[in-house]
Amino acid sequence: MKHTHKLWIALILTGIVGGMVGIALTELMHFIQHTAYGYGTGGGHVSFREGVVQTSSERRILVLILCGVAVGFGWWSIKRFSRPQIEIKAALKQPLQGLPFLTTVSHALLQIITVGLGSPLGREVAPREMTAAFASVGGRRLGLDEDDTRLLLACASGAGLAAVYNVPLASTLFILEAMLGIWTQQAVAAALLTSVTATAVARIGLGDVQQYHPAHLDVNIPLLWFAAAIGPVLGATAVWFQRSAKKFPFLKRNDPKIIPLAIALFALIGIVSVWFPEILGNGKAGNQLTFGGMTDWRYSLEMTAVKWFVVLLALAAGAYGGLITPSMMLGSTIAFAAAAAWNTFFTAMSSESAAVIGAAAFLGVYLKMPLTAIVFILELTYAPAALLMPLCITMAGAVVTARKMGFE
Protein backbone atom coordinates (compact mmCIF):
# COMPACT_ATOMS: atom_id res chain seq x y z
CA MET A 1 0.00 0.00 0.00
CA LYS A 2 1.28 3.47 -0.85
CA HIS A 3 2.54 5.58 2.02
CA THR A 4 0.03 8.38 1.28
CA HIS A 5 -2.87 5.95 1.16
CA LYS A 6 -1.93 4.60 4.59
CA LEU A 7 -2.13 8.08 6.10
CA TRP A 8 -5.56 8.88 4.70
CA ILE A 9 -6.94 5.49 5.68
CA ALA A 10 -5.60 6.07 9.18
CA LEU A 11 -7.25 9.50 9.31
CA ILE A 12 -10.64 8.12 8.26
CA LEU A 13 -10.43 5.31 10.80
CA THR A 14 -9.37 7.80 13.46
CA GLY A 15 -12.44 9.92 12.74
CA ILE A 16 -14.66 6.85 13.08
CA VAL A 17 -12.98 5.83 16.33
CA GLY A 18 -13.23 9.40 17.63
CA GLY A 19 -16.98 9.40 17.04
CA MET A 20 -17.40 6.04 18.77
CA VAL A 21 -15.27 7.17 21.71
CA GLY A 22 -17.38 10.32 21.97
CA ILE A 23 -20.59 8.28 22.10
CA ALA A 24 -19.24 5.83 24.68
CA LEU A 25 -17.79 8.44 27.03
CA THR A 26 -20.81 10.72 26.81
CA GLU A 27 -23.19 7.87 27.61
CA LEU A 28 -20.94 6.75 30.46
CA MET A 29 -20.87 10.25 31.94
CA HIS A 30 -24.66 10.59 31.69
CA PHE A 31 -25.15 7.18 33.32
CA ILE A 32 -22.90 8.18 36.23
CA GLN A 33 -24.66 11.54 36.62
CA HIS A 34 -28.12 9.98 36.62
CA THR A 35 -27.10 7.23 39.04
CA ALA A 36 -25.17 9.46 41.43
CA TYR A 37 -27.76 12.22 41.66
CA GLY A 38 -30.87 10.11 41.11
CA TYR A 39 -32.53 11.93 38.24
CA GLY A 40 -33.65 11.16 34.70
CA THR A 41 -35.08 7.74 35.55
CA GLY A 42 -38.67 8.68 34.73
CA GLY A 43 -38.04 9.47 31.09
CA GLY A 44 -37.80 12.86 29.44
CA HIS A 45 -34.80 15.13 29.29
CA VAL A 46 -33.53 16.58 32.55
CA SER A 47 -30.32 18.62 32.47
CA PHE A 48 -27.50 17.97 34.91
CA ARG A 49 -28.14 21.38 36.49
CA GLU A 50 -31.80 20.54 37.08
CA GLY A 51 -30.91 17.10 38.38
CA VAL A 52 -28.41 18.46 40.89
CA VAL A 53 -30.81 21.17 42.09
CA GLN A 54 -33.47 18.52 42.76
CA THR A 55 -31.04 16.42 44.81
CA SER A 56 -30.77 16.82 48.58
CA SER A 57 -27.81 18.65 50.09
CA GLU A 58 -26.71 15.53 51.94
CA ARG A 59 -26.62 13.51 48.73
CA ARG A 60 -24.53 16.14 46.96
CA ILE A 61 -21.96 16.10 49.74
CA LEU A 62 -21.81 12.29 49.83
CA VAL A 63 -21.39 12.09 46.05
CA LEU A 64 -18.57 14.63 46.14
CA ILE A 65 -16.85 12.69 48.93
CA LEU A 66 -17.07 9.62 46.68
CA CYS A 67 -15.64 11.74 43.88
CA GLY A 68 -12.74 12.68 46.15
CA VAL A 69 -12.06 9.00 46.80
CA ALA A 70 -12.02 8.34 43.05
CA VAL A 71 -9.73 11.32 42.42
CA GLY A 72 -7.27 10.59 45.18
CA PHE A 73 -7.04 6.82 44.96
CA GLY A 74 -7.57 6.67 41.20
CA TRP A 75 -4.77 8.97 40.11
CA TRP A 76 -2.48 7.79 42.88
CA SER A 77 -2.91 4.25 41.53
CA ILE A 78 -2.28 5.31 37.93
CA LYS A 79 0.86 7.21 38.91
CA ARG A 80 2.03 4.42 41.20
CA PHE A 81 1.41 1.33 39.07
CA SER A 82 1.08 2.38 35.42
CA ARG A 83 3.56 3.45 32.80
CA PRO A 84 4.36 7.19 32.85
CA GLN A 85 1.60 9.24 31.32
CA ILE A 86 2.37 11.29 28.19
CA GLU A 87 0.19 14.28 27.36
CA ILE A 88 -0.83 14.80 23.75
CA LYS A 89 1.18 18.01 23.35
CA ALA A 90 4.29 16.16 24.57
CA ALA A 91 3.55 13.23 22.26
CA LEU A 92 3.47 15.57 19.26
CA LYS A 93 7.12 16.42 19.90
CA GLN A 94 8.11 12.74 19.75
CA PRO A 95 5.19 11.13 17.90
CA LEU A 96 6.87 7.79 17.21
CA GLN A 97 7.24 7.24 20.95
CA GLY A 98 3.46 7.03 21.07
CA LEU A 99 1.06 7.13 23.98
CA PRO A 100 0.98 4.37 26.63
CA PHE A 101 -2.36 2.83 25.71
CA LEU A 102 -3.62 1.39 29.00
CA THR A 103 -2.39 4.35 31.04
CA THR A 104 -4.04 6.83 28.68
CA VAL A 105 -7.35 4.95 28.53
CA SER A 106 -7.45 4.56 32.33
CA HIS A 107 -6.62 8.24 32.74
CA ALA A 108 -9.43 9.23 30.35
CA LEU A 109 -12.01 6.97 31.97
CA LEU A 110 -11.19 8.35 35.41
CA GLN A 111 -11.73 11.89 34.14
CA ILE A 112 -15.20 10.98 32.85
CA ILE A 113 -16.08 9.18 36.10
CA THR A 114 -15.06 12.13 38.27
CA VAL A 115 -16.73 14.76 36.07
CA GLY A 116 -19.87 12.62 36.11
CA LEU A 117 -19.71 12.61 39.91
CA GLY A 118 -19.47 16.40 39.95
CA SER A 119 -15.81 17.36 39.61
CA PRO A 120 -15.81 21.03 38.49
CA LEU A 121 -13.36 20.36 35.65
CA GLY A 122 -14.13 19.70 31.99
CA ARG A 123 -14.75 16.45 30.15
CA GLU A 124 -13.19 17.25 26.77
CA VAL A 125 -9.64 16.05 27.47
CA ALA A 126 -10.80 12.45 28.00
CA PRO A 127 -12.16 11.77 24.48
CA ARG A 128 -9.21 13.60 22.97
CA GLU A 129 -6.72 11.43 24.86
CA MET A 130 -8.54 8.16 24.30
CA THR A 131 -8.91 8.77 20.56
CA ALA A 132 -5.23 9.71 20.36
CA ALA A 133 -4.31 6.50 22.19
CA PHE A 134 -6.10 4.41 19.55
CA ALA A 135 -4.53 6.51 16.78
CA SER A 136 -1.09 5.96 18.27
CA VAL A 137 -1.55 2.20 18.06
CA GLY A 138 -2.91 2.44 14.53
CA GLY A 139 -0.11 4.66 13.30
CA ARG A 140 2.48 2.28 14.70
CA ARG A 141 0.90 -0.75 13.01
CA LEU A 142 0.66 1.05 9.68
CA GLY A 143 4.30 2.08 9.90
CA LEU A 144 3.67 5.81 9.50
CA ASP A 145 6.69 8.10 9.68
CA GLU A 146 7.22 10.84 12.26
CA ASP A 147 5.48 13.69 10.40
CA ASP A 148 2.46 11.59 9.47
CA THR A 149 2.13 10.22 12.99
CA ARG A 150 2.27 13.74 14.41
CA LEU A 151 -0.53 14.80 12.06
CA LEU A 152 -2.54 11.70 12.95
CA LEU A 153 -2.26 12.29 16.71
CA ALA A 154 -3.22 15.95 16.40
CA CYS A 155 -6.23 15.06 14.25
CA ALA A 156 -7.22 12.35 16.72
CA SER A 157 -7.24 14.91 19.51
CA GLY A 158 -9.51 17.17 17.49
CA ALA A 159 -11.77 14.28 16.51
CA GLY A 160 -12.49 13.54 20.17
CA LEU A 161 -13.39 17.18 20.76
CA ALA A 162 -15.64 17.27 17.68
CA ALA A 163 -17.50 14.15 18.77
CA VAL A 164 -18.47 15.25 22.28
CA TYR A 165 -19.35 18.86 21.45
CA ASN A 166 -20.75 18.48 17.91
CA VAL A 167 -18.37 21.17 16.60
CA PRO A 168 -16.65 19.98 13.39
CA LEU A 169 -15.36 23.36 12.19
CA ALA A 170 -14.13 24.52 15.60
CA SER A 171 -12.35 21.19 16.06
CA THR A 172 -10.68 21.62 12.67
CA LEU A 173 -9.38 25.00 13.79
CA PHE A 174 -8.37 23.51 17.15
CA ILE A 175 -6.15 20.97 15.39
CA LEU A 176 -4.51 23.64 13.25
CA GLU A 177 -4.27 26.48 15.77
CA ALA A 178 -3.79 24.79 19.13
CA MET A 179 -2.22 21.43 18.32
CA LEU A 180 -0.12 21.74 15.14
CA GLY A 181 0.41 25.46 14.66
CA ILE A 182 0.60 24.97 10.89
CA TRP A 183 -1.89 25.67 8.07
CA THR A 184 -0.64 23.58 5.15
CA GLN A 185 -3.13 22.17 2.64
CA GLN A 186 -2.47 18.64 3.88
CA ALA A 187 -3.02 19.63 7.51
CA VAL A 188 -6.25 21.49 6.71
CA ALA A 189 -7.62 18.57 4.67
CA ALA A 190 -6.67 16.03 7.34
CA ALA A 191 -8.19 18.11 10.14
CA LEU A 192 -11.44 18.59 8.22
CA LEU A 193 -11.66 14.90 7.32
CA THR A 194 -11.23 13.58 10.85
CA SER A 195 -13.39 16.24 12.54
CA VAL A 196 -16.30 15.87 10.13
CA THR A 197 -16.09 12.07 10.24
CA ALA A 198 -16.04 12.00 14.04
CA THR A 199 -18.98 14.39 14.24
CA ALA A 200 -21.01 12.38 11.73
CA VAL A 201 -20.39 9.13 13.61
CA ALA A 202 -21.17 10.71 16.99
CA ARG A 203 -24.47 12.06 15.65
CA ILE A 204 -25.58 8.48 14.97
CA GLY A 205 -25.50 7.74 18.69
CA LEU A 206 -25.97 11.16 20.29
CA GLY A 207 -27.99 13.07 17.72
CA ASP A 208 -27.34 16.47 16.17
CA VAL A 209 -27.43 18.25 19.52
CA GLN A 210 -27.29 22.00 20.05
CA GLN A 211 -25.29 22.32 23.26
CA TYR A 212 -26.77 25.66 24.40
CA HIS A 213 -30.05 27.44 23.66
CA PRO A 214 -29.37 31.11 24.39
CA ALA A 215 -32.14 33.68 24.46
CA HIS A 216 -32.20 37.13 22.88
CA LEU A 217 -28.87 37.13 21.04
CA ASP A 218 -29.45 40.60 19.67
CA VAL A 219 -26.67 42.75 18.24
CA ASN A 220 -26.78 46.55 18.38
CA ILE A 221 -24.33 49.45 18.58
CA PRO A 222 -24.20 49.47 22.42
CA LEU A 223 -23.11 45.80 22.32
CA LEU A 224 -20.16 46.76 20.10
CA TRP A 225 -19.07 49.45 22.55
CA PHE A 226 -19.50 47.00 25.42
CA ALA A 227 -17.41 44.44 23.54
CA ALA A 228 -14.58 46.95 23.25
CA ALA A 229 -14.79 47.76 26.96
CA ILE A 230 -15.07 44.22 28.33
CA GLY A 231 -12.32 42.65 26.19
CA PRO A 232 -9.36 43.92 28.24
CA VAL A 233 -11.13 42.96 31.47
CA LEU A 234 -11.64 39.40 30.28
CA GLY A 235 -8.09 39.15 28.94
CA ALA A 236 -6.60 40.23 32.26
CA THR A 237 -8.90 37.96 34.25
CA ALA A 238 -8.05 34.95 32.08
CA VAL A 239 -4.34 35.56 32.68
CA TRP A 240 -4.90 35.76 36.43
CA PHE A 241 -6.90 32.53 36.33
CA GLN A 242 -4.14 30.75 34.41
CA ARG A 243 -1.50 31.95 36.85
CA SER A 244 -3.54 30.87 39.85
CA ALA A 245 -4.30 27.44 38.38
CA LYS A 246 -0.76 26.50 37.38
CA LYS A 247 0.37 26.39 41.02
CA PHE A 248 -1.51 23.16 41.71
CA PRO A 249 -1.55 20.39 42.84
CA PHE A 250 0.22 20.88 46.15
CA LEU A 251 1.43 17.29 46.33
CA LYS A 252 2.67 14.90 43.68
CA ARG A 253 -0.05 12.52 42.62
CA ASN A 254 2.05 9.47 43.54
CA ASP A 255 2.26 10.67 47.14
CA PRO A 256 -0.27 8.67 49.22
CA LYS A 257 -1.05 11.84 51.20
CA ILE A 258 -2.93 13.07 48.13
CA ILE A 259 -5.73 10.57 48.88
CA PRO A 260 -7.01 12.07 52.17
CA LEU A 261 -6.35 15.56 50.78
CA ALA A 262 -8.54 14.84 47.75
CA ILE A 263 -11.34 13.46 49.94
CA ALA A 264 -11.24 16.54 52.18
CA LEU A 265 -11.15 19.05 49.34
CA PHE A 266 -13.95 17.39 47.41
CA ALA A 267 -16.02 17.21 50.58
CA LEU A 268 -15.55 20.99 50.78
CA ILE A 269 -16.68 21.30 47.15
CA GLY A 270 -19.77 19.30 48.09
CA ILE A 271 -20.52 21.65 50.98
CA VAL A 272 -20.15 24.67 48.68
CA SER A 273 -22.55 23.05 46.21
CA VAL A 274 -25.31 23.19 48.81
CA TRP A 275 -25.58 26.92 48.09
CA PHE A 276 -24.17 26.93 44.55
CA PRO A 277 -25.24 23.73 42.75
CA GLU A 278 -24.21 25.18 39.37
CA ILE A 279 -20.52 24.85 40.24
CA LEU A 280 -20.70 21.06 39.94
CA GLY A 281 -19.70 19.52 36.65
CA ASN A 282 -17.78 21.19 33.88
CA GLY A 283 -19.49 24.58 33.95
CA LYS A 284 -22.30 24.02 31.47
CA ALA A 285 -24.86 24.73 34.19
CA GLY A 286 -23.52 28.23 34.76
CA ASN A 287 -23.43 28.93 31.03
CA GLN A 288 -27.03 27.79 30.70
CA LEU A 289 -28.06 30.39 33.27
CA THR A 290 -26.17 33.30 31.72
CA PHE A 291 -26.81 32.42 28.08
CA GLY A 292 -30.50 32.03 28.84
CA GLY A 293 -30.79 35.13 31.02
CA MET A 294 -31.99 32.99 33.93
CA THR A 295 -29.99 34.68 36.68
CA ASP A 296 -29.11 38.15 37.96
CA TRP A 297 -25.83 40.02 38.20
CA ARG A 298 -25.29 39.25 41.88
CA TYR A 299 -25.57 35.50 41.51
CA SER A 300 -23.51 35.70 38.32
CA LEU A 301 -20.62 37.34 40.18
CA GLU A 302 -20.97 34.86 43.02
CA MET A 303 -20.75 31.99 40.52
CA THR A 304 -17.57 33.53 39.08
CA ALA A 305 -15.86 33.58 42.45
CA VAL A 306 -17.11 30.19 43.60
CA LYS A 307 -16.38 28.38 40.32
CA TRP A 308 -12.85 29.80 40.31
CA PHE A 309 -12.43 28.63 43.91
CA VAL A 310 -13.68 25.07 43.38
CA VAL A 311 -11.64 24.60 40.19
CA LEU A 312 -8.54 25.45 42.22
CA LEU A 313 -9.67 23.03 44.94
CA ALA A 314 -10.07 20.24 42.38
CA LEU A 315 -6.64 20.93 40.89
CA ALA A 316 -5.11 21.05 44.37
CA ALA A 317 -6.67 17.64 45.04
CA GLY A 318 -4.84 16.20 42.05
CA ALA A 319 -7.84 15.91 39.73
CA TYR A 320 -7.38 16.00 35.98
CA GLY A 321 -9.84 17.39 33.47
CA GLY A 322 -10.34 19.96 30.78
CA LEU A 323 -10.80 23.67 31.29
CA ILE A 324 -12.72 24.61 28.15
CA THR A 325 -16.17 24.81 29.73
CA PRO A 326 -14.97 26.02 33.16
CA SER A 327 -13.18 28.93 31.48
CA MET A 328 -16.27 29.64 29.37
CA MET A 329 -18.35 29.80 32.54
CA LEU A 330 -15.96 32.27 34.15
CA GLY A 331 -16.04 34.48 31.07
CA SER A 332 -19.81 34.31 30.67
CA THR A 333 -20.57 35.13 34.31
CA ILE A 334 -18.14 38.07 34.36
CA ALA A 335 -19.57 39.51 31.14
CA PHE A 336 -23.18 38.92 32.21
CA ALA A 337 -22.65 40.82 35.46
CA ALA A 338 -20.80 43.61 33.64
CA ALA A 339 -23.66 43.88 31.15
CA ALA A 340 -26.09 44.55 33.99
CA ALA A 341 -23.92 47.45 35.14
CA TRP A 342 -23.63 48.73 31.56
CA ASN A 343 -27.39 48.65 31.06
CA THR A 344 -27.85 50.70 34.23
CA PHE A 345 -25.85 53.65 32.92
CA PHE A 346 -25.89 53.35 29.12
CA THR A 347 -28.21 52.35 26.29
CA ALA A 348 -29.35 48.80 26.89
CA MET A 349 -28.03 45.79 25.03
CA SER A 350 -28.51 42.03 25.34
CA SER A 351 -26.99 40.57 28.51
CA GLU A 352 -27.21 37.13 26.94
CA SER A 353 -25.14 38.27 23.95
CA ALA A 354 -22.65 39.76 26.39
CA ALA A 355 -22.37 36.41 28.17
CA VAL A 356 -21.71 34.57 24.91
CA ILE A 357 -18.93 36.91 23.77
CA GLY A 358 -17.47 36.86 27.27
CA ALA A 359 -17.31 33.07 27.30
CA ALA A 360 -15.50 33.01 23.96
CA ALA A 361 -12.97 35.70 24.88
CA PHE A 362 -12.01 34.11 28.19
CA LEU A 363 -11.65 30.71 26.53
CA GLY A 364 -9.63 32.10 23.63
CA VAL A 365 -7.11 33.79 25.88
CA TYR A 366 -6.86 31.05 28.50
CA LEU A 367 -6.20 28.25 26.01
CA LYS A 368 -4.38 30.47 23.48
CA MET A 369 -6.77 29.68 20.64
CA PRO A 370 -8.73 32.84 19.79
CA LEU A 371 -9.90 31.76 16.33
CA THR A 372 -11.02 28.37 17.58
CA ALA A 373 -12.89 29.94 20.49
CA ILE A 374 -14.90 32.26 18.23
CA VAL A 375 -16.06 29.44 15.97
CA PHE A 376 -16.52 27.11 18.95
CA ILE A 377 -19.04 29.42 20.62
CA LEU A 378 -20.93 29.93 17.35
CA GLU A 379 -21.26 26.17 16.82
CA LEU A 380 -22.25 25.53 20.44
CA THR A 381 -24.99 28.17 20.50
CA TYR A 382 -26.10 28.42 16.85
CA ALA A 383 -25.57 32.16 17.31
CA PRO A 384 -26.30 34.43 14.33
CA ALA A 385 -23.42 35.55 12.11
CA ALA A 386 -24.08 39.13 13.24
CA LEU A 387 -22.47 38.20 16.56
CA LEU A 388 -19.11 37.79 14.82
CA MET A 389 -18.37 41.52 15.01
CA PRO A 390 -18.68 41.85 18.81
CA LEU A 391 -16.95 38.49 19.22
CA CYS A 392 -13.95 39.68 17.22
CA ILE A 393 -13.84 43.06 19.00
CA THR A 394 -13.88 41.42 22.43
CA MET A 395 -11.33 38.80 21.45
CA ALA A 396 -8.95 41.41 20.04
CA GLY A 397 -9.03 43.46 23.24
CA ALA A 398 -8.63 40.36 25.39
CA VAL A 399 -5.68 38.96 23.41
CA VAL A 400 -3.83 42.30 23.26
CA THR A 401 -4.25 42.78 27.01
CA ALA A 402 -3.02 39.25 27.74
CA ARG A 403 0.07 39.82 25.60
CA LYS A 404 0.77 43.10 27.39
CA MET A 405 0.71 41.12 30.64
CA GLY A 406 3.35 38.74 29.30
CA PHE A 407 0.97 35.89 28.49
CA GLU A 408 2.29 34.51 25.19
Can you say where each PLM-predicted feature lies in the sequence?
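Alpha-helical transmembrane segments and immediately membrane-proximal extracytoplasmic
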Residues: 1-408
